[in-house]
Regions:
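Inter-Walker segment of RecA-like/P-loop motor cores
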Residues: 108-162
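Conserved Walker A/P-loop ATP-binding site and its immediately adjacent core
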Residues: 94-115
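ASCE P-loop NTPase helicase motor core
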Residues: 171-256, 380-391
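N-terminal accessory segments
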Residues: 1-65, 123, 340, 350-353
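SF2 helicase catalytic motif II
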Residues: 162-174
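ATPase catalytic-site recognition across NTP-hydrolyzing enzymes
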Residues: 231-321
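Mg2+-dependent endonuclease catalytic cores in nucleic-acid-processing enzymes, primarily RNase H-like
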Residues: 201-216, 237, 337-401
Length: 401
């Protein structure tokens, strides 16, 4: 190799280190895995999927806004730490904030970053100007980290950053107000990244945030990562291993093999509760929010069973209407035939007459036997408007509060 070839090769390597996170992680970063000892950071299946998803959003939108709902111990916080570390050391003037739900959690996340730094090759490691429990500043490039805890006193309000990692947001004490503060911390410009990640914590404010993301009603893209994506979540089986009926149904529905089912069975035994397992290790996003501590009218077991059951449509068509109260709220209509909801449609910004017109069109085209309208909390004139509109076509409409 000539000196010119060597210079070109070194230049290509440096550029790839800068532009390719997966290459950078494998070559420059060290992890301490569950078994101990440091080893190169090679993306696992969950990390690869998340990386591809985030990069696709960044290429399309110019910025990153994602909310991640995950099973436990998939290495997601480790990936996010690597991603933001890579951006921070290669972009002068960039600030990154790490926010955990409690002080110890924030400290643990910060230790991952410091381990990355301490074990890097000195030729690519930026010099440090400040290093303490709450800050890591790279002086010559004017980039660095701030570490804090989610509190009620305006999370991150006094800081300005371009990168933000918010961890275990389902366990934050006042998520709506804390999110309002955070959205002021990171400017709404290209090149910025806000990444929220968490395991579930029952029916709470995070569930509402997640549902909005799923419905496309927020700027955050939802990313769900089930436990089954991790090839390590398996257990060797004996020759006499047999699945029970529920396990066979799970295996068929989610394409799980016997070793995955065996791991699940052992983990349920460790947790001491089959109801707790889906919250810690969900297979679909919806079951993550089913908590054994939630005193619901319908038991979690029945909800999970219903979600897994395939029901063919049959019988008469009934329409359910949930009209918006006011403003830009959403009106939703469901088509039900027998025990199956065939579809749901939602529209925003409709007034009373527009909703009536929509329902009347459905009556004419789909010919339902009955329309049920939920008018709870709506003013009396709303109910009267429906009654007058549908009396003209002699159609039975039920309004229930």
């Amino acid at each position: 190799m000539t000196w010119l070839d060597q210079v070109l090769a070194e230049g290509e390597h440096a550029e790839r280190m800068r532009s390719d996170l997966e290459h950078f992680a494998r070559r420059a970063l060290k992890l301490r895995p569950k078994a101990g000892m440091l080893e190169p950071f090679i993306f696992n299946a969950a990390q690869k999927k998340l990386h591809e998803t985030i990069e696709a959003q960044r290429a399309k939108m110019g910025r990153v806004r994602v909310v991640i709902l995950k099973a436990r111990q998939l290495g997601i916080s480790t990936y996010i730490a690597a991603r933001l570390f890579h951006r921070t050391i290669y972009n002068p003037g960039l600030r990154t904030i790490i926010i955990g739900h409690e002080k110890r959690a924030s400290s643990n996340l910060f230790q991952i970053v410091k381990r990355y730094y301490d074990n890097m090759d000195e030729t690519i490691r930026p010099s440090i100007g400040i290093s303490n429990a709450e800050e890591l500043i790279f002086d010559k490039i004017d980039s660095g980290y701030i570490v804090t805890v989610a509190t009620n006193e305006g999370t991150g309000r006094s800081a300005t950053a371009q990168m933000l990692h918010a961890s275990e947001v389902a366990f934050w004490t006042d998520l709506p107000s804390q999110m309002a503060s955070l959205m002021q911390t990171v400017p709404d410009v290209d090149g910025t990244e806000i990444i929220l990640e968490t395991t579930a914590n029952g029916f709470n404010d995070f569930q509402a945030l997640w549902r909005k993301a799923e419905a496309g009603e927020s700027e955050f893209m939802p990313v769900f990562l089930p436990w089954s994506i991790d090839p390590g979540y398996r257990r060797e089986i004996d020759s006499d291993f047999e699945m029970d009926s529920d396990e066979r149904a799970l295996s068929h529905l989610y394409k799980l093999d016997a070793e995955q089912i065996a791991w699940r069975r052992a983990k349920i035994s460790q947790l001491g509760s089959a109801e707790r397992f889906p919250q810690e290790y969900p297979l679909v996003a919806s079951e993550a929010f089913i908590s054994s501590n939630f005193d619901s009218f319908i038991s979690p077991d029945l909800v999970i069973k219903a979600r897994r059951e395939k029901v063919d449509p049959y019988g008469i068509l009934i329409i359910g209407v949930d009209p918006a109260g006011s403003g830009d709220a959403r009106t939703s209509i469901a088509w039900r035939r027998g025990r199956r909801i065939e579809k749901v449609e939602s529209r925003r910004g409709l007034d009373t007459m527009q909703v009536c017109g929509w329902v009347r069109k459905i009556i004419r085209e789909d010919k339902p036997v009955k329309v049920n309208i939920d008018v709870g909390g709506l003013p009396p004139n709303y109910c009267e408007a429906f009654a007058l509109r549908f009396a003209a076509i002699a159609f039975p409409v039920s309004t229930a509060r």
